[in-house]
């Protein structure tokens, strides 16, 4: 990884590792808590917080998570493989993602491009020691907000 990138970065919504070349996939190996999980051939991989589950991850067919839930959501972007589902894991489990193919990728955090990743570069995602606190106006609950934003009706 680029040496100018700080060793620790924080994301409110997501970290995304995406292909750089149009028309090609990127190959990414994923470890969960030090154990190999799988390798993805995909346009990218989204590692989202519950807050970020309603952003890019949702548009990639990932689930919507309650913001009260503590979890990390792994959502592949246009995967070229049989296992094409999102995975919800405990935030205490470290997730490592390594670029294993010869095609490079871009690391973005909360929509901001951070650096280019090449074969052998790894990104580690784990829980922050800081908890985000949000200001709420009114007495609206998460499920009420979802209903309003997506036009969901009572039946």
Segments from the language model and where they lie:
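Catalytic phosphate-donor-binding core of small-molecule kinases
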Residues: 1-46, 54-155
């Amino acid at each position: 990884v680029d040496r100018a990138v700080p060793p620790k970065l924080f994301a409110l919504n997501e970290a995304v590792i995406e292909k750089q070349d149009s028309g090609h996939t990127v190959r990414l190996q994923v470890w969960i808590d030090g154990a190999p999980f799988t390798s993805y051939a995909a346009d990218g991989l989204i590692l989202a917080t519950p807050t970020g589950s309603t952003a890019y991850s949702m548009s990639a067919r990932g689930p919507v998570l309650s913001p009260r839930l503590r979890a990390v959501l792994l959502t592949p972007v246009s995967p070229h493989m049989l296992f094409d589902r999102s995975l919800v894991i405990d935030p205490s489990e470290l997730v490592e993602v390594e670029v294993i193919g010869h095609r490079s990728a871009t690391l973005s955090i909360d929509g901001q491009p951070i650096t280019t990743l090449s074969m052998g570069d790894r990104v580690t995602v784990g829980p922050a020691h800081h908890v985000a606190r949000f200001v709420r106006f009114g007495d609206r609950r998460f499920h009420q907000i979802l209903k309003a934003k997506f036009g969901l009706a009572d039946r």
